[in-house]
From Swiss-Prot:
Disulfide cysteine pairs (residue numbers): none
Organism: Schizosaccharomyces pombe (strain 972 / ATCC 24843)
A cellular-component GO term for this protein: nucleus
Annotated keywords: 4Fe-4S, DNA damage, DNA repair, Glycosidase, Hydrolase, Iron, Iron-sulfur, Lyase, Metal-binding, Mitochondrion, Nucleus
GO biological process: base-excision repair; base-excision repair, AP site formation; mitochondrial DNA repair; nucleotide-excision repair
Active site (record annotation): K142 (nucleophile)
Gene Ontology molecular function: 4 iron, 4 sulfur cluster binding; 5-formyluracil DNA N-glycosylase activity; 5-hydroxymethyluracil DNA N-glycosylase activity; 8-oxo-7,8-dihydroguanine DNA N-glycosylase activity; class I DNA-(apurinic or apyrimidinic site) endonuclease activity; DNA binding; DNA-(apurinic or apyrimidinic site) endonuclease activity; metal ion binding
Cofactor binding, per record: Binds 1 [4Fe-4S] cluster. The cluster does not appear to play a role in catalysis, but is probably involved in the proper positioning of the enzyme along the DNA strand.
Gene that produces this protein: nth1
Entry keyword DNA-binding: no
Catalysed reaction equations from the record: 2'-deoxyribonucleotide-(2'-deoxyribose 5'-phosphate)-2'-deoxyribonucleotide-DNA = a 3'-end 2'-deoxyribonucleotide-(2,3-dehydro-2,3-deoxyribose 5'-phosphate)-DNA + a 5'-end 5'-phospho-2'-deoxyribonucleoside-DNA + H(+)
Descriptive protein name: Endonuclease III homolog
InterPro entries associated with the record: DNA_glycosylase, Endonuclease-III-like_CS2, HhH-GPD_domain, HhH_base_excis_C, HhH_motif, NTH1
UniProt family annotation: Belongs to the Nth/MutY family.
């Protein structure tokens, strides 16, 4: 790893050549829909403007989305995407045309402001220095250096995006936290003739093999030759992740034949009488003669003749007997509740056994 700026890694050239060989065998999205392919080269001034627009739209946007968006602008705008088109179109319509790119609301404002600044300060053309380019809204160092290389054919710096920053740190070419630190570290030792092509090569390599998620180290020759310090080996290209599956413990159901026999409960056979209450926690039974209670069940019902009712006669006064015999016929709440709970539990247990 290069610890100090200006000190190149020992095997950087061998590593870079291997990346170029792998990159030559695949077609990456940047090869066909990158910013350097989206401008009309038959008109140099228009090409420079379209390149700047493409770079401004490229931030937080994939190339597979950037390409169709640029074609949409060229087809829908009257001048085929020139400075006058951006000046004349309203923000709502422009926002609709670029709605697929990331942060399209903010980029709509940037494009309108950029067109006004170019018309007022730069005679309708884009600036020819990085410093002036970065004065435009929404244009940073990466866009500025790439625009100088593509639009003006002047390479004054390395355009470092997330792919270049990530891969250079994986290769231990630098140990940096930001894209600007990576650019300064690379420019301190990388030959200047490789500054422009480095971005295109590493971006394509990062889009096809050294992916941000799920790096294909099994396909990378840097891994097989031991040139990548961050490579990891897998048995196959398929990564199997084991998950813990929660299992529900099933209780073995007991058949009804094995259920324990019900124990008989001795209940008083005396006549029971309960007064009705609101919560219905007591059992209300009919009054029966304790001696003839069983014999009455087998006898047929007898209809008694209706007695003559005297309208003027007053109804008898009801009274409660307090004799010992009457008190013994009353059943306490405790006994009633206990017997009710017993039968409820036995019934539920029998139902569970049957199910």
């Amino acid at each position: 790893m290069s610890k100090d700026y200006g000190t190149p890694p020992e095997n950087w050239r061998e590593v870079y050549d291997e990346i170029c060989k792998m990159k030559a065998k695949v077609v990456a999205p940047v090869d066909v829909q990158g910013c350097h392919t989206l401008g009309e080269r038959n008109d140099p001034k228009k090409f420079r403007f379209q390149t700047l627009v493409a770079l401004m739209l490229s931030s937080q946007t994939k190339d597979i989305v950037l390409g169709p968006t640029m074609r949409n602008l060229k087809e829908k705008l009257a001048g085929g995407l020139c400075l006058e088109d951006i000046q004349n179109i309203d923000e709502v319509s422009l926002n609709k045309l670029i709605e697929k790119v990331g942060f399209h609301n903010r980029k709509t404002i940037y494009l309108k402001q950029m067109a006004r600044i170019l018309s007022e300060k730069f005679q309708g053309d884009i600036p020819d220095t990085v410093e002036d380019l970065m004065t435009l809204p929404g244009v940073g160092p990466k866009m500025g250096y790439l625009c100088m290389s593509i639009a003006w054919n002047k390479t004054v710096g390395i355009g470092v995006d997330v792919h270049v920053h990530r891969i250079c740190n994986l290769l231990h070419w630098c140990n940096t936290k930001t894209e600007e630190q990576t650019r300064a570290a690379l420019q301190s030792w990388l030959p200047k003739e490789l500054w422009f092509e480095l971005n295109h090569t590493l971006v394509g390599f990062g889009q096809t093999i050294c992916l941000p998620r799920g790096r294909r180290c099994d396909m990378c020759t840097l891994s097989s030759k031991g040139l990548c310090p961050s490579a990891f080996k897998e048995k196959s290209g398929i990564t199997i992740t084991k998950r813990k599956v929660k299992t529900i413990k099933r209780v073995k159901k007991r058949p009804a034949s094995e259920s324990p026999p019900l124990s008989p409960l001795s209940l008083p056979t005396d006549d029971l009488y309960y007064q009705s209450i609101e919560d219905k926690s007591l059992i209300k039974l009919e009054d029966l003669d304790p001696v003839d209670s069983i014999s009455h069940m087998n006898e047929p019902l007898k209809k008694e003749p209706a007695a003559d009712i005297d309208v003027d006669q007053k109804p008898p006064v009801a009274f409660h007997s307090t004799t010992k015999e009457t008190r013994s016929l009353r059943r306490s709440k405790r006994v009633a509740k206990k017997s009710s709970q017993y039968f409820s539990q036995q019934s539920l247990q029998d139902i569970e056994d049957l199910v």
